[in-house]
Structures are given as structure tokens and as C-alpha cells.
């Protein structure tokens, strides 16, 4: 469907604009990157005798944005060569070139009047039928298009990328009442298939889906922290990997985003939602406002909730803010018995259930924050989205959470949690009451490799539509298509003469069982299949060899170099044979199908 989009214009070369341009180039699209011209010369330009009319001066801002994207970590480009697909220019001289592109993406400063002025200029040169979108994180899409031509409004929508665009999977697509359905479908198809994004369809409401929920969630956690006398280190220890969230947890995430940015988003949201039943939570506490006044805005300022400095002997040491005294102190490792015990539980579901219903400080904090977030998010349907699937995907893909809001509700148990909410005097959302009144006990059901979600409109389960061309191994296995398995690996029949060797040991480390299944797969695929895919849908493809298990599996004694070398040599030979067999199968079959994880790209978490 998206075959006609081959050239893109990105308007704005700031952090987001330049990285969006980079990722479009990664997908093989030609990109025109434009920005404003400088109004003053810098010292170096004056020394060279340049003027404001010199091209080097005019393109200074846009070229600097592109150069920053080339150097940013993690890398915005697949390869340095890809940057050659990007051409730079300025609005005053080069805006007419948008007449030759297929998609125009606006990514300038978050001010409605400035965006509208630029889009009005774009309309002078844009050819009819060209798609135009805005990367705004919360300005109403409809307001930007007001007064534009009928053709412009029909081809205009929001496309909210999350930072960094290459790594965070989420793309919120926000149509208006005027946007043509085929335009929405074309952008969604392009961004899914070529840009690798996870598409969520949001309504044109303040901050859309992900940032609406995240703003409430983060500020509510701060409120619970203050009321309960928790430290910043304690909160981060309770809101990170132990509950299926990134290592950056709560406050390290805000340091990455920038506290000034986070408060700007919160203040705009507060002004835009006068009828929000929890609007009071959107008011940041005084200590956070004071941090911004002092310039303690996070990593970009060198200090925020955390501060890194050189200690004695040049050793790096980390400090953390005491929000009561507004002084930094050495960060302490958090030691809470229930947290330490929970870390020994491998299963995230069981770990969360254990912690959230705990009777200690950890349980109290997690219950108060999670229950409030569940209720708040449930009350946002149908305001911000029509179904729970789009909301859950926005939370997972935008912030790298293992579970979306309604998936998390299933994890802790709908009936059990609702009973506790009632004990606490909390009001149960109509959506949840409707679920329970219908006799259902969960928001999702899984049957024979298919996933169903509770549909608010019908009050019944509705199947989550499978994505064409995407294979989900869990679903395939639930359809009893496993040829053979052991504790570390499985051989799965994908259909069409293709088998898949999936690793599923702890962290997908390769041990004796994995190699045994490799050897079996070579023989089985050679006799009964056309091709073999080696893949899995875990966070790690493989962390490498489990040397201890490999050695034990060979029957050799551990600790002697000659035995170690012999074992490795033998395994290298087996791996070579295995690889050659896979190559033969792949060359016979061709490119094969897409094998991709819905929840991949867990590379950090930050607001878009």
C-alpha cells in the first residue's frame, strides 16, 4: 500500500526531527531536511568574512542538527553511509522543494501558532494528495489544520514518534475527523513495514495516549513517595525491572527526559483537561519546580534527581537528591527484604503478584501507585482510545514496560484487586464493572494460539487481529505445531516448508540441550523441510555459551585447559556443520517470512 512513498521532507532539525530523518533514511527513503536560517553570525563565521547570505551560514542550524544525529548514542543511523540519503536546506530558500516529496513531517517547536504559520507556507508548495503529518506530542491535530484547504485537511494527521525514533517502537497515529481512511492506512502500513514501528491509533485528545497515562502515573508516584516518606532510591528500586519496567525506573527516566520537559508537558496537560477527575495530581510538587528554577533538569544539566561527580582519586561517584533538604547525598543501595526476596523469583508475573499484595512498605507503595493507575487509565476509555489493546500497546512500546495497563490488571487478578479497591473506598470504573457483570474475570483470553480482548462496545471478547506477515512463536506453539522440544530449545513448524529453531533457556544461553536440538534440527530440516529460521522473540537472542554446561555436557572435567580447548573445538565444528545446513536451506527457500516480536526494542525509556 505504501509503495508510493519514497521521498520524505522533515521540517525541523532538532533532536526529534533529525532522528526521524535518520530513521527514514535507514529505511531507504530519500529525505529533505529543512530548518530556519540563523539571524546572527557566530565568531567563526565573522572571522571567515561570511555573511547571513552565505550558504554555509544559512544551513548552519540544519547541518548542525544532522551532524548531531550522526554522533548521537545510541546511533540514529544504521550505517554512516545512510546519511547520504539526506539533503539539507532552509525554509526560506528550499521549502518549494516539498512539491517533489510524498510525505511531509512537521517536527518544529511545540507552539501552535508557529506550527500553523509553517504549515500555511507548506500548503503553497505542496502538491495535491501529498500526506502531511505533525510529530507534536500533544498539540491538537485539528487545531493545526483549521483554515487549511479541503485537500490539505484530508491528507493531514498526527504521527507522534517516541525518542529515540530508531529504538522505541511506538508510533501514535492520530487522524482528525477530516483525515481520509486510506491516508491513515497508508501511513500505518509504511511505518509498520518500512520503519519497523508499532502502530497505535489514538484520538485527538491532549497528550494522546502514552504521555497522558505516563504523566499521571509519574506524578502520582511522586505524590505517594512524599506522603509515605520514601526516598528517590527506594522508588526507583520498586519501579524498575522487579516489576517488568526498564532499569531507568522512575526518576532516572525523568533525568533522561529532562525535568523541565516533563513539567512543561504536565502543565500543558493540566490546562487542557479541566474535567479530568484526577486533575489535582497533574500539579507538580514544589520541590520539582524548585529543581527547574535551579537548573537541576537532569542529565543534560549534569544533575537532576541524580548527580554524577568525581570523588577521591578521580573515581566516579553517584549522588541522589534528598527532596526534603534539597541537598545531594551519596546514593545508597536499597535493601528491603521483600524486594531482595522477589528478585529471586524468575517469573515476572509471580514477582509482581507477590510484591503488590505485600504487607510492607513495598506492597503499600506498589498497591497505591498501580491501583490508581489502573483506575485512571480505565476511565480514559473511550476518551483517548476505543479499546484496551491500543492503550496497552502504547504503554509497552512507548515506555518498554513488559505489561500494558490492562495486561497488568490481569496479572494481579481483576476480582482480587477490585475487592481490595472496594475495601480502600476506591470507585470502580464503569468499564471494569461491565467486565465483572458479564461474568468475565480477565481483560484478555488466550485460546489455541489466538488472543481475545474485552471489547467495551459489545461487552464481549473480540479477537486481536493478527498482523499480516508477522509470525508470533507463542501462538504457533499453542497450536501444537512443536516438532520437538527440550528444556532449552524447540523446533517449530511455521508452515510452507519452513521450520524455526527457537532458543528458550535462561537468557537463551547456549548449552548442551541447545546444541542437541541444533543437531536434531539439521537432520530433521534436511529430510522434511525446505528452510530453517533460527530465531526467538526474547529480549536477548542469546547471551552466548553456557561454558559450564557445555563442558559438563561433554563429560569432561572442568578446569583443565586441554579439556576446555577440546570441548570448544568440537562444538565449533558442530556449529560450522549446523550453519552450513542452515545456509543451504535458506538459499533453497528464499527470503522467507517476517519473524518479529510485538514487544521488541527494549532500549531504554523516555517521553516522546
Put a short name on every predicted segment.
Residues 2-539, 547-580, 587-591, 599-601, ...:
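N-terminal glycine-rich phosphate-binding loop for ADP-containing cofactors
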Residues 596:
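Conserved divalent-metal-coordinating catalytic cores
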Amino acid at each position: 500500500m505504501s509503495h508510493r512513498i519514497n521521498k520524505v521532507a522533515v521540517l525541523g532539525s532538532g533532536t526529534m526531527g533529525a532522528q526521524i530523518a535518520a530513521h527514514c533514511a535507514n529505511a531507504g527513503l530519500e529525505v529533505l531536511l529543512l530548518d530556519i536560517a540563523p539571524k546572527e553570525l557566530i565568531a567563526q563565521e565573522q572571522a571567515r568574512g561570511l555573511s547571513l547570505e552565505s550558504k554555509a551560514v544559512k544551513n548552519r542550524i540544519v547541518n548542525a542538527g544532522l551532524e548531531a544525529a550522526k554522533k548521537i548514542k545510541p546511533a540514529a543511523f544504521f550505517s554512516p553511509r545512510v546519511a547520504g540519503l539526506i539533503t539539507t536546506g532552509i525554509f526560506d530558500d528550499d521549502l518549494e522543494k516539498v512539491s517533489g516529496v510524498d510525505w511531509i513531517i512537521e517536527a518544529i517547536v511545540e507552539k501552535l501558532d508557529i506550527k500553523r504559520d509553517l504549515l500555511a507556507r507548506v500548503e503553497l508548495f505542496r502538491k495535491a494528495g501529498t500526506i502531511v503529518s505533525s510529530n507534536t506530542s500533544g498539540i491538537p491535530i485539528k487545531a493545526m489544520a483549521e483554515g487549511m484547504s479541503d485537500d490539505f485537511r484530508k491528507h493531514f494527521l498526527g504521527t507522534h514518534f517516541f525518542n529515540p525514533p530508531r529504538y522505541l517502537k511506538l508510533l501514535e497515529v492520530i487522524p482528525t475527523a477530516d483525515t481520509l481512511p486510506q491516508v491513515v492506512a497508508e501511513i500505518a502500513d509504511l511505518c509498520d513495514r518500512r520503519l519497523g514501528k508499532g502502530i497505535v491509533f489514538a484520538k485527538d485528545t491532549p497528550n494522546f495516549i502514552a504521555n497522558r497515562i505516563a504523566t499521571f502515573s509519574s506524578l502520582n508516584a511522586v505524590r505517594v513517595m512524599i506522603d509515605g516518606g520514601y526516598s528517590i532510591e527506594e522508588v526507583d528500586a520498586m519501579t524498575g525491572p522487579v516489576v517488568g519496567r526498564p532499569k531507568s525506573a522512575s526518576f532516572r527516566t525523568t533525568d533522561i527526559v529532562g525535568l523541565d520537559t516533563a513539567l512543561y508537558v504536565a502543565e500543558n496537560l493540566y490546562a487542557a483537561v479541566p474535567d479530568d477527575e484526577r486533575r489535582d495530581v497533574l500539579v507538580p510538587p514544589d520541590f520539582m519546580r524548585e529543581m527547574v528554577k535551579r537548573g537541576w533538569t537532569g542529565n543534560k544539566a549534569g544533575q537532576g534527581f541524580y548527580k554524577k561527580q568525581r570523588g577521591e582519586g578521580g573515581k566516579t561517584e553517584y549522588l541522589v537528591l534528598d527532596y526534603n533538604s534539597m541537598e545531594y547525598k551519596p546514593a545508597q543501595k536499597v535493601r528491603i527484604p521483600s524486594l531482595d526476596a522477589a528478585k529471586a523469583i524468575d517469573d515476572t508475573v509471580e514477582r509482581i503478584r507477590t510484591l503488590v499484595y505485600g504487607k510492607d512498605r513495598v506492597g503499600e507503595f506498589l498497591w497505591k501507585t498501580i491501583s490508581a493507575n489502573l483506575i485512571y487509565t480505565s476511565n480514559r476509555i473511550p476518551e483517548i482510545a476505543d479499546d484496551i489493546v491500543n492503550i496497552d500497546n502504547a504503554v509497552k512500546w512507548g515506555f518498554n514496560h513488559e505489561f500494558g495497563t490492562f495486561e497488568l490488571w490481569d496479572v494481579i487478578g481483576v476480582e482480587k484487586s477490585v475487592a481490595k479497591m472496594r475495601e480502600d473506598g476506591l470507585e470502580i470504573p464503569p468499564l471494569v464493572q461491565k467486565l465483572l457483570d458479564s461474568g468475565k474475570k480477565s481483560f484478555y483470553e488466550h485460546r489455541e494460539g489466538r488472543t481475545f480482548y474485552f471489547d467495551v462496545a459489545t461487552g464481549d471478547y473480540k479477537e486481536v487481529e493478527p498482523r499480516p506477515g508477522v509470525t508470533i512463536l507463542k501462538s504457533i506453539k499453542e497450536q501444537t505445531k512443536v516438532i520437538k522440544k527440550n528444556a532449552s530449545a524447540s523446533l517449530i513448524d511455521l508452515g510452507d516448508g519452513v521450520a524455526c529453531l527457537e532458543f528458550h533457556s535462561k537468557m537463551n544461553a547456549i548449552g548442551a540441550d541447545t546444541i542437541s536440538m541444533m543437531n536434531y534440527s539439521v537432520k530433521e530440516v534436511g529430510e522434511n523441510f525446505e528452510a530453517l529460521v533460527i530465531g526467538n522473540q526474547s529480549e536477548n537472542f542469546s547471551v552466548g555459551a553456557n561454558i559450564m554446561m557445555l563442558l559438563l555436557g561433554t563429560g569432561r572435567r572442568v578446569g583443565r585447559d586441554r579439556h576446555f580447548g577440546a570441548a570448544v573445538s568440537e562444538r565449533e565444528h558442530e556449529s560450522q556443520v549446523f550453519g552450513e545446513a542452515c545456509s543451504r536451506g535458506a538459499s533453497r527457500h528464499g527470503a522467507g517470512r517476517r519473524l518479529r516480536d510485538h514487544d521488541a526494542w527494549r532500549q531504554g525509556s523516555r517521553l516522546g
